């Protein structure tokens, strides 16, 4: 084949509107995804009904592996920190959207990544891979949003360094 099956998830990015954002709709999506995960209603069983054989075989493989593993912890400090940052940026998006023409679409991609991790938390391989694929945009998004909000270079650099140090320290602690 000419592409990997996982590249299909990139098609979602093509459908995003980069000019405007309905912030309450995106905030609602985050809360709905968490509500589904808390109640134990996952969309993972629905994927099994897709009639495309490569997707079904991958799904069966990942699902059989996930029975051995635990679910993804969507209440860890890293994920909740990302959700808090996304909600904060959604609340101030009208103030910061003029910093970069890519900020709105980057914020939407970031929220999609967070929601994928939350909704597929019962399938760790899919949740982590897909989430990391989309949430890697935070490298651009968070510094740009901080600069747009504070408009002071030293302050936003300091906050960005603290944010990075907190998550780096957390990843070191959980690594060992």
Task: State each model region's role.
Residues 1-16, 118:
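Membrane-interface alpha helices of multi-pass inner-membrane proteins
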Residues 3-5, 18, 54-58, 136-142:
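Alpha-helical transmembrane segments and their membrane-interface exit regions
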Residues 12-16, 86-89, 138-149:
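Transmembrane alpha-helical segments
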Residues 14, 18-130, 174:
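Alpha-helical transmembrane segments and terminal signal-anchor/GPI-anchor hydrophobic tails
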Residues 20-23, 144-158:
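Membrane-interface junctions at the ends of membrane-embedded or membrane-associated helices
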Residues 31-32, 151-171:
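Signature aromatic-anchored transmembrane alpha helix within multi-pass, membrane-resident enzymes
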Residues 107, 111-114, 138-141, 160-164:
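Residues within membrane-spanning alpha-helices of integral membrane proteins
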